Amino acid sequence: VLDARIFDMTNAVTARDYDRAAAVLAELFRMQTEPIAILAALSRELRQLYTARLALDGKKDAVWVKDLWRMTSDYPAKKLMQSARAVSRSWCRDAVRRCQTLDRRMKSERNMDAEGALKLFLMELAGAR
């Protein structure tokens, strides 16, 4: 369920629908999903999106992405390719880097407002589009 909701949230960001992305994040918080678990799933999704963007730039197709990530179906690879068309390579690279930075902060800073940091990160992703 978490991966599917993160997929929805990332698609909303790439579609410039911040309200929908924020609603998904709020739903995950209401379900008491740990912020670090949300970030881990988001990190994977952003890395996959970056891979799809690189595939597009390299004239590769969804099957290549599917095989690389060992997906069992074409559907998620096709959706990734569709989302990747809406973002630039630099946006993807920066999103992955910022995600890594937030991950280090969440794991090392005491008394961090992890939910607030995730909300801010989501707004930054949406705003940087």
Tell what function each PLM region has.
Residues 112-129:
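Acidic, carboxylate-rich catalytic segments that either coordinate divalent cations
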Residues 39, 43-46, 96, 100, ...:
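Generic structural concept
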Residues 51-54, 104-111, 127:
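Charged/polar positions within long, soluble alpha-helices
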Residues 79-111:
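C-terminal capping/gating helix-and-loop segments adjacent to ligand/active sites or protein-protein/ligand interfaces
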Residues 68, 83, 98, 121, ...:
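Residues that form generic nucleotide/phosphate-binding pockets
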Residues 1-91, 129:
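Small-residue-rich helix-loop
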Residues 8, 101, 117:
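Broad gene-expression machinery/nucleic-acid interaction feature
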